[in-house]
Regions:
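Active-site beta->alpha loop and helix N-cap motifs at the rims of alpha/beta catalytic domains
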Residues: 1-59
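Helix-coil boundary/capping segments in enzymes
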Residues: 2, 98-101, 185
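Short, electropositive alpha-helical surface patch
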Residues: 4-12, 66-73, 178-181
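Catalytic alpha/beta core domains of metabolic enzymes, predominantly
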Residues: 39-45, 53-165
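Conserved short secondary-structure transition element at the edge of the structured enzyme core
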Residues: 113-116, 154-192
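Alpha-helix initiation and N-capping motif
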Residues: 129, 168, 184, 199-200
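Interfacial loop at the N-terminal end of multi-pass membrane proteins
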Residues: 148, 193-194
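Long, low-complexity C-terminal extensions of enzymes
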Residues: 197-205
């Protein structure tokens, strides 16, 4: 997949570690990313690691990050951190100066940015990207923007609302109504299409 995407000359890709297998060692995770990067063979392509251990079952720790940066300093440039562990996120921003840490959580995005994080990559940004972008880009001017905290709370509320449903189905339902395009509702099991999203005020409202 990474090799095919690279053909389109994208600047960066977000890559999960190989998952399904339990008790994978750090060496195994490093070898997985090493093989992906070497087989793609694009010296210009940037890689953003994706740490979401509660879903993948694989945790990307300090040793993995450090070794991959040493092996591929021009390619491994950042990580989306979706573990929800704020202390760990802040340690990463402090320890790896040239490494871009992106919060995978809307509720933690502002705190991470204030402590050296690069921004946020979240599911919610598919439907409220402009709002999240404003929060991230203006976090240093928070005190001079009257409703800044309200905007942050709104972003979190959108996420909470989205995740009262199966999030991918809800995202697709929202986009199908927003763009009046039923192609958004194409979805594969075990995920199911949300029926009559126009009537679901929780999502559309």
């Amino acid at each position: 997949y990474s090799k095919e995407v690279a053909k389109f000359k994208v600047k960066a890709i977000l890559v999960l570690p190989a998952f399904y297998y339990k008790n994978v060692s750090n060496e195994g995770v490093i070898e997985f990313y090493k093989r992906v990067i070497e087989e793609v063979g694009d010296s210009d392509l940037k890689y953003i690691l994706y740490n979401i251990p509660h879903v993948s079952g694989v945790s990307i720790g300090f040793e993995v990050i450090e070794q991959l940066i040493k092996l591929f300093p021009n390619n491994v440039v950042g990580m989306k951190e979706s573990s929800g562990d704020l202390d760990n996120m802040l340690k990463i921003t402090k320890f790896f100066n040239e490494f871009s840490l992106f919060s995978g959580s809307d509720s933690l995005a502002l705190k991470v940015c204030k402590r050296g994080g690069a921004g946020a990559i979240t599911a919610t940004s598919n439907i409220s990207g402009k709002l999240l972008s404003f929060i991230v880009n203006n976090h240093k001017e928070e005190s001079s923007i009257d409703n800044f905290q309200e905007l942050q709370l709104l972003q979190v509320k959108i996420r909470e609302t989205l995740f009262t449903h199966e999030s991918v189905s809800a995202l697709k339902a929202f986009m199908s109504v927003k763009q009046d395009n039923q192609e958004w509702n194409r979805i594969n099991p075990p995920l199911l299409r949300m029926e009559n999203p126009q009537n679901n005020k929780t999502i559309i409202g």
